[in-house]
Swiss-Prot record:
Signal peptide: none annotated. Disulfide bonds: none annotated. This is Ribosomal RNA small subunit methyltransferase G. Its EC number is 2.1.1.-. It comes from the Bacteria. It comes from Dictyoglomus thermophilum (strain ATCC 35947 / DSM 3960 / H-6-12). Belongs to the methyltransferase superfamily. RNA methyltransferase RsmG family. The lineage of its organism: Bacteria, Pseudomonadati, Dictyoglomota, Dictyoglomia, Dictyoglomales. Keywords: Cytoplasm, Methyltransferase, rRNA processing, S-adenosyl-L-methionine, Transferase. It is an enzyme of class 2 (transferase).
Length: 240
């Protein structure tokens, strides 16, 4: 089972023109086993098949590396990380990053804490809070080179969660599909309100999956009133 897992992982990762060393492959296998075990107790993922998890969680997360490879990135925040996607796969791939995982559900925090021990990852901070609260905290506000938020909310909502964390000159990496790209394009006014500018769109294809990344550069400080109080961005989204 383990060797089959690693073989599939290698094949799928190679479609991104990336490669993993044996230790990285082992860590992804341990991640997979922990995910399967904990998923019996709490709802971490609806995916069950080995290849499906490899492709739609691990490889999809690693695809985020492509748009940022030439950027000077040290600190990353993964907002609404859930079971650790995409932050932990990125950290496994390159341990130089200092990673903050933000999650509002306590049961998922417990999984992440256990997972970090299993994978023996350093420079990983796990924070139990909401983005609307943490984005006001001076220890986190505008402190990150890169913010990620995978499948958290619609673009005009997730932008309000994410951009306050990004330092001037840093990046929020929006993750779109052909089906929702228009929502990102319609949210460009919100990008500007929050201090960002969409620099480029990068399309990546692997295993019949298309991902479109929007590299949003932080060019101005986010106005102090954002993010608004918990729940408000979702109830009253900033209009495109």
């Amino acid at each position: 089972m383990e060797e089959n897992f690693k073989r599939i992982l290698r094949e799928k990762v190679s479609e991104l023109n990336l490669s993993l060393d044996p230790l990285q492959e082992e860590k992804f296998y341990l991640y997979y086993m922990a995910l399967k075990e904990w998923n019996r107790k709490i709802n971490l993922t609806s995916l069950e098949g080995e290849e499906e998890i490899i492709l739609k969680h691990f490889v999809d997360s690693l695809s985020c590396i492509i748009p940022i490879r030439n950027e000077n990135i040290e600190r990353i925040i993964d907002i609404g990380t859930g079971a650790g996607f995409p932050g932990i796969p990125i950290k496994i791939y390159d341990e130089k990053y200092k990673l903050t995982l933000l999650e509002s559900q306590k049961k998922k925090i417990l999984f992440l804490e256990e997972l970090i021990k299993i994978l023996e990852l350093s420079d990983v901070e796990i924070v139990w809070d909401r983005a609307e609260n943490l984005g006001k905290d001076p220890r986190y506000r505008e402190q990150f080179d890169l913010a990620l938020a995978r499948g958290v909310a619609k673009p005009n909502i997730v932008l309000e969660y994410a951009l306050p964390f990004v330092k001037t000159g840093g990046i929020f990496l929006g993750q779109a599909t052909p089906n929702n790209l228009s929502e990102w394009e319609n949210a460009q006014k919100v990008v500007g309100i929050l201090g960002g500018k969409t620099e480029e769109k990068i399309e990546i294809n692997f295993d019949n999956i298309t991902r479109i990344f929007l590299k949003i550069r932080k060019i101005n400080n986010t106005p102090e009133k954002y993010p608004r109080r918990p729940g408000i961005p979702e109830k009253r989204p900033l209009l495109p």
